[in-house]
């Protein structure tokens, strides 16, 4: 079958501000098995440019695919763009089969199939096996009810098949790297870069996380095979930077150590950045030198909040003392720390921001990223926040960088100014400037320069958009009225029983 995979353009700050793009790992992961099954597969990455709607439609029509696969890693905020593009494509290509996948459609499939008649199928959960089975069923005119992990319409009824089995062995399906020109992708200040995934899922129980349930359970690739893929990408394609897509790659100390040692044995000079938990860093204090020798240059630490009571409320499972010790240990081993701090979990006041500033200064991270809580209805936090008022009705702004919920005691502008003030104070304090200017490690210094430059661009962009661009409502619907009933009981879309 002639298949086109479309990565739609995204207006989010992370997509537009850096002026660099990373390859769409999720779509490439779907493409690999389709290529191996003998299909004619092409990927159109509309993030470059970005392409306009008309340019995308013309390119898709010129290719004239039989089937279109569409999805985006920022699936909640990208959904309106997907709907708009597929509507245009349906008008031009009435016989095109349109298949939509990702985290957001996995949970909102009923709403989407009700409101968006141009979309034919939705893939729920992991797509590597499911998409290939769906296409085989379409080609052979088999019963679609027997394809696990999909949703579709039949006789004006929405059909949801059984959950697809969770992929037990992540090395079974390969990434279709040949679908893109890897030399076009860069990150972190011009380094040729890819997104790559060692593990899926997370064993922790944070009640606001929209990813944990989607992956069902934490699983990892074979550490030696994963290392060999990195070596191949570096030596064959010149990839310098590897951005880990994992929620938590360091869950298993022995497995992660095996990966680090496999990379070290290859004697290659690469940069690895990603996310992990502070308690893993503290646990691994005796092997952090292996992290650095393997190329780990920066880890994002999801601290989420500086208040112990809030951390307990959201089931983060960490302590502020552990967070600070993790940052200290990373610095001791010349690994940069990027601390994420999320506000608006609960009703906030000025004193909460003052306390947050004091605590973040105490943490002393190299870099900081402030986010706003963004509830998903398949998480248990959604039920907690369901009666809060929504102030942002534009779904493209539900990207963690925009306020979406009203606060009783503070207007949005004051929350915004507090968040920006904290960022500025953290990044311009003498200690931070000294590290920026006199960072002894050349590679780390370059990374800090790049992050600082991006921070300046983001600050200007956010100030202009908050006061002159974004539109908020004062008496919006409740969260439940906006998104619908909670789906906590459907948080895990995969079958975890071995077949």
Curated annotation (Swiss-Prot):
The keyword Protease does not apply. Its cofactor is [4Fe-4S] cluster; adenosylcob(III)alamin. Disulfide bonds: none annotated. GO terms for biological process: light-independent bacteriochlorophyll biosynthetic process; photosynthesis. Pathway: Porphyrin-containing compound metabolism; bacteriochlorophyll biosynthesis (light-independent). NCBIfam families: BchE. Belongs to the BchE family. This is Anaerobic magnesium-protoporphyrin IX monomethyl ester cyclase. It comes from Synechocystis sp. (strain ATCC 27184 / PCC 6803 / Kazusa). The lineage of its organism: Bacteria, Bacillati, Cyanobacteriota, Cyanophyceae, Synechococcales. The gene is bchE.
């Amino acid at each position: 079958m002639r298949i086109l995979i479309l990565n739609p353009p995204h207006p989010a700050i992370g997509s537009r501000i850096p002026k660099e793009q990373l390859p769409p790992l999720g779509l490439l992961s779907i493409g690999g098995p389709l290529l191996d099954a003998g299909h004619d597969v092409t990927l159109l990455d509309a993030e470059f440019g970005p392409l306009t709607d008309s340019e995308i439609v013309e390119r898709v029509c010129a290719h004239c695919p039989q089937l279109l696969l569409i999805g985006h890693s920022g699936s909640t905020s990208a959904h309106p763009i997907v709907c708009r593009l597929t509507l245009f494509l349906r008008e031009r290509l009435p016989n095109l089969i349109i298949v939509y996948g990702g985290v957001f459609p996995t949970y909102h499939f009923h709403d989407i199939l009700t409101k968006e008649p141009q979309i034919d199928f939705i893939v729920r959960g992991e797509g590597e096996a499911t998409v290939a089975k769906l296409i085989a069923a379409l080609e052979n005119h088999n019963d679609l009810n027997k394809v696990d992990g999909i949703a579709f319409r039949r006789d004006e009824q929405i059909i949801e098949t059984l959950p697809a089995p969770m992929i037990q062995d992540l090395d079974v399906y390969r990434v279709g790297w040949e679908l893109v020109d890897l030399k076009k992708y860069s990150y972190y200040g011009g380094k040729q870069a890819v997104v790559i995934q060692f593990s899926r899922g997370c064993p922790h129980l944070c009640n606001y996380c929209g990813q944990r349930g989607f992956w069902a359970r934490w699983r990892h690739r074979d550490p030696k095979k994963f290392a060999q893929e990195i070596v191949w990408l570096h030596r064959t394609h010149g990839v310098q930077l590897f951005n880990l897509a994992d929620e938590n790659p360091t869950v298993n100390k022995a497995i992660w150590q095996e990966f680090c040692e496999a990379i070290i044995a290859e004697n290659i000079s690469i940069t690895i950045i990603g996310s992990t938990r502070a308690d893993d860093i503290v646990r691994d204090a005796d092997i952090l030198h292996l992290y650095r020798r393997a190329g780990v240059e920066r880890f994002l630490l999801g601290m989420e909040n500086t208040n112990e009571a809030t951390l307990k409320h959201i089931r983060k499972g960490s302590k502020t003392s552990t967070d600070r010790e993790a940052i200290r240990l990373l610095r001791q081993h010349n690994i940069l720390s990027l601390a994420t701090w999320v506000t608006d979990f609960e009703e906030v006041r000025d004193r909460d921001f003052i306390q947050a500033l004091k605590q973040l200064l105490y943490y002393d991270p190299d870099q900081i990223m402030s986010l706003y809580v963004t509830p998903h209805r398949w998480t248990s936090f959604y039920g907690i926040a369901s009666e809060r008022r929504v102030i942002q009705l534009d779904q493209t702004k539900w990207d963690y960088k925009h306020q979406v919920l009203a606060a009783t005691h503070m207007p949005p502008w004051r929350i915004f100014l507090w968040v920006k003030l904290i960022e500025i104070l953290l990044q311009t304090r003498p200690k931070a400037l000294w590290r920026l200017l006199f960072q002894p490690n050349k590679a780390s210094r370059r990374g800090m320069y790049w992050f600082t430059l991006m921070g300046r661009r983001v600050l200007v962009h956010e100030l202009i958009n908050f006061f002159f661009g974004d539109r908020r409502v004062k008496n919006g619907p409740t969260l439940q009225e906006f998104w619908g009933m909670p789906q906590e009981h459907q948080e895990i879309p995969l079958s975890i029983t071995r077949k």
